[in-house]
Amino acid sequence: MSMSIALHAVLPPAAATPRRRPTRLRASSTEAPASGEKGQEDTDRKSGTGMRRRRRRAKKVQEVGLEALYDDGFGEATVRDYFDALRATPLDGGGGGGPPRWFCPVECGPPAVHAPPLLLFLPGIDGVGMELIMQHKSLGKVFEVRCLHIPVNDRTPYEGLLQIMEESVKYEHNLSPNRPIYIIGDSFGGCLALSLASRNPEIDLVLILVNPATSFAKTPLQAILPLLEMVPSNLPVTLPHLLRYLIGDPLKMAMVSIQNNTSPQDTLESFSDSLSSMLPLLSEFGHIVRMDTLVWKLKLLMSGVDYTNSRLNAVQAEILLLASGNDNLPPSGEADRLFKALKSCKVRYFRTSSDRLLMESSFNLLTVIKGASMYRQGKQRDTITDFLPPTISEFKRTFGEDFKLLHHLLSPVMLSTLRNGKIVRGLAGVPDKGPVLLVGYHQLLAMEITSMAEEFLREKKAVLRTLAHPVFFVGNYEILRQELSFFDVVPLYGGVQVSPINTYRLFERDEFVLLYPGGIREALHRKDEDYQLFWPDQPEFVRMAAQFGVTVIPFGCVGEDDMLEIVLDYNELKNIPYIRETIESFNQDCPGVRSTVKGEEGNQVLHLPAVLPKLPGRLYYLFGKPIEMKGMDGVQRDRESANQLYLDIKSEVENIMSYLKRKREQDPYRSITARTFYQATWGVTAQIPTFEP
């Protein structure tokens, strides 16, 4: 992909003139309302009319917005494109220096969502501003992206840079005071972002910090800074060890674009291609950057680090800190220090990645933001309207790599029931359009969810909006700080906190809703409780489904007893002193559900049972005959009718599981050994047969 600086909309110097209104960069359907319309909205907000109008508008936006498995363009750009862009960029500001300036990468294109938030990228100490190039297309779908470029020969001091950015941020905030401003700070840019947030606590900022250089004072380079000042100022910086602090380590940068699953020959070819593209650039960059420039950059970094560390306690912004494991500048433990010092901070570690995290071929920044539940368009995150559907690249990564082995071990069999009662393989019996409510049994450790989410996306292109426990959304359980934990996968693939209001809103938007009435009592059941339902006597979802004409599909799944064996359940764990205190402490901090429900149905204690794996069997699903709730007005008014339908659905789920337990005995490929032989004969992509329904 050839690039040139002419392909980027370079805006005037940031301190010179204000930028255009964000709405002028978007389609007319997403422009800000006129003053009269805004006044009407304020009036309507106080009445039911405004609520109905906003709902209709939200539904309309959903219809023309992003669809599940949309192409986000991630992976199209490579490190070589970064080198090409760097070569085409006038690093010295066109020969005359010049103040810092903002530019809009054309690769981002027009945003595909309604009223996207603004995203500002602050570069590292090199100041080029192109380090985000491999993320441009994916971020450009949901953000309005602008990047800061600081010419090599620019001598704006640290507080001068802050003033430039502050003017821009305040201008944008005045244009859209109810929308957040995202700031991505890479290395030195992380210091700028934190300093900016400390000076403007009243502005709604969301900071994405990538290996912030807040620990530069502890690095060896600071110790040799006095020696560098003694070197002649006009001497070109040609030493790779010094250049790597500006544009990175050549060998590491050549390696970041190599895919993990490529052959040795392709790996060598890709590495050679990247390195050959970079070496001429190093020579060019080395002749542009003089020793006095390097010394200035390092002093600028030192002043920024000192300024930032002295004001960490004043930062009020929401923060996502991304730390790679073998980074150059932040030493081990810096991410933990910042996590403790900052008020609202989430951390994600990428222990096998280099310090050039943004240019890793497998690193998708938008996926990380979505998984951490950090994407929002208003002052508060709305899990319904702010949800971004999974992309095709996320689908391939999650189910083609992360859960590939699990899918192979489970070898799920999906069956559904047509309206005439015939059972077929696949999801043909499930409607193609919502609103649909899937109600069923929660297997041990929720092992059935990933396969269901994959199959509905693959066959129906439908996102399952799982009504999940609040533990996935409330609280900051950062003990699971890793690249992609299950806590991130749940919101990434449509999970929302279980509540009547969220269920109501999902039905209103014609979504596919997944409900487990048994909750974690079923998913964390005790010994000898396999396939036992723990449904409370609360048929409210039936009445709500009737109100919206929802199609209810009872389903069951079996196979957990072929996969895992419970060694210690909750009744045994609570008798072990240390473990008992840990469970009690965790549940005290965690918001509970069903506190008013008596009996075992309300015993929703979060814990982790000790289990042992078995020689894998197989997972079986059966989606029952659809129950059309449209026209069932009597269910809404008559509680007795609602209770009876609720019991009928529960009975159908139990019958489905009894059917599957009986029929799986007839499956010749229930054992993983038989399935392995079959795939060895017919190929790993061949669908493995099962019993005749």
Predicted regions, residues:
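Non-catalytic C-terminal accessory region of glycerolipid acyltransferases
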Residues: 367-406, 505-693
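Catalytic active-site module of serine/aspartate enzymes centered on a nucleophile-bearing elbow/loop
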Residues: 7-11, 71-94, 343-388
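Short beta-strand/loop motif that positions the catalytic acidic residue
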Residues: 314-316, 321-323
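Conserved HGGG/HGGXW glycine-rich cap/lid loop of the alpha/beta-hydrolase fold
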Residues: 62-155
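Conserved alpha/beta-hydrolase "acid-adjacent" motif
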Residues: 328-334
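Flexible "cap/lid" loop of the alpha/beta hydrolase fold
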Residues: 198, 202-253
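Catalytic core of membrane glycerolipid acyltransferases/transacylases, capturing the structured
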Residues: 434-503, 508-509, 519-537
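Active-site loop/oxyanion-hole signature of alpha/beta-hydrolase fold enzymes
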Residues: 76, 112, 143-184, 198
